[in-house]
């Protein structure tokens, strides 16, 4: 499970050092893809395979389904961390997420997310305000 917030930097070659807590689960390989809110989703290969199977079950007669699958999968990149735990983020994904040098890598349960640090701080400041009322809006979460 991916938890916490980490603050790595993007190096000049477009690489990020994965948080130590995430490396074991991602050591054999991972998939980077576009996420909502202009972040990058990071899935273990196993979790991405599970998600892909769910997508295969979705009705392709739905235009919305086809559009989502195209955008989600066309931006995906499978990567293997090097011995130092570094992963290269493809230029197209860096541009999509507007990544600068300072990053925020957050745990989101079954996935991690890579954000530009400023974008994450702005998002968090906006969402924390309503966080205390969220349990009323999402019954059964606790």
Swiss-Prot record:
Gene3D superfamilies: Transcriptional regulator MraZ domain (3.40.1550.20). One of its GO terms (molecular function) is transcription cis-regulatory region binding. GO terms for biological process: negative regulation of DNA-templated transcription initiation. CDD domains: MraZ_C, MraZ_N. Its main location: cytoplasm. Residues 5-47, 76-119 form the SpoVT-AbrB domain. It holds the Pfam family MraZ. GO terms for cellular component: cytoplasm; nucleoid. It is found in: Cytoplasm, Nucleoid. Keywords: Cytoplasm, DNA-binding, Repeat, Transcription, Transcription regulation. Forms oligomers. Belongs to the MraZ family. This is Transcriptional regulator MraZ. It comes from Arthrobacter sp. (strain FB24).
């Amino acid at each position: 499970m991916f938890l916490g917030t980490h603050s790595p930097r993007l190096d000049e070659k477009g690489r990020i050092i994965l948080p130590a807590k995430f490396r074991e689960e991602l050591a054999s390989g991972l998939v980077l893809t576009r996420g909502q809110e202009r972040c990058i989703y990071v899935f273990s290969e196993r979790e991405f395979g599970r998600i892909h199977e769910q997508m295969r079950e979705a009705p392709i007669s739905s235009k919305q389904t086809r559009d989502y699958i195209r955008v989600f999968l066309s931006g995906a990149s499978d990567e293997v961390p090097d011995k130092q735990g570094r992963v290269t983020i493809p230029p197209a994904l860096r541009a999509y997420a507007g990544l600068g040098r300072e990053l925020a890598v957050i745990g989101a349960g079954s996935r991690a997310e890579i954000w530009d640090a400023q974008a994450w701080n702005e998002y968090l400041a906006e969402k924390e305000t309503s966080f205390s009322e969220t349990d009323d809006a999402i019954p059964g979460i606790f």
